[in-house]
Amino acid sequence: MDLTIVIVSFKSGDILHRCIKSIDVKFPIIIIENSIDQNLKLDLEKKYPNVNCILPRENLGYSGGNNLALSKVKTDFALILNPDVVLEKNCIENFFVTANKVLDFGIIAPVSVEERYDNFDPIKDLNIKEVENVKGFAMFFNMKNLKWCNFFDDNFFLYLEEIDLCKRLRLKNTKIFIDPSIKVRHFGGSSHIPEINRPMELSRNWHWMWSTFYFNKKHN
């Protein structure tokens, strides 16, 4: 299967290992470790032969980190994952089944078995749905239909970057789907080690305010 996994991490610890272990070793994984910790890079690449851990020159955030990884992708498809996501059985295979059904798409998203959805019941309704936007914890990218927009806007360090991307894709009539038959587990709010909870909370609050301001200025 023509796929590369992309994960952006910042001292994600055991959470990241749990994510990697849910991915079949035959798929290459590019990890952007935004903490720029050489020991983490060495540890990951030693434990997992399919992992290429890249240390950027500075913390690039979610958008910049993903863009750096996506610039290295040579496959036709990429699966963007948060570190706090675990793939359910046959998840990747089901992405390709759906990709062969909808063909000309930009993004396909799964559902998280932990989350509720406003417009449908993912347990009862398994039909593929075209949607306006998806949540960024897991996104299956059709690379040829996203390269034109340069993927994420680097001005979003954290938050709203996937909403912005989906909005730009829709303006070019690029389709976005969610498929309830594709399932992951998303343990939201736990993408880093507990020791840095307080500074990470302060950082998240600041970036939420900035991203909200920038998004509204950009699109209104």
Model-derived segments and spans:
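Glycine-rich, basic loop-to-helix element that forms the pyrophosphate-binding segment
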Residues: L55-V73
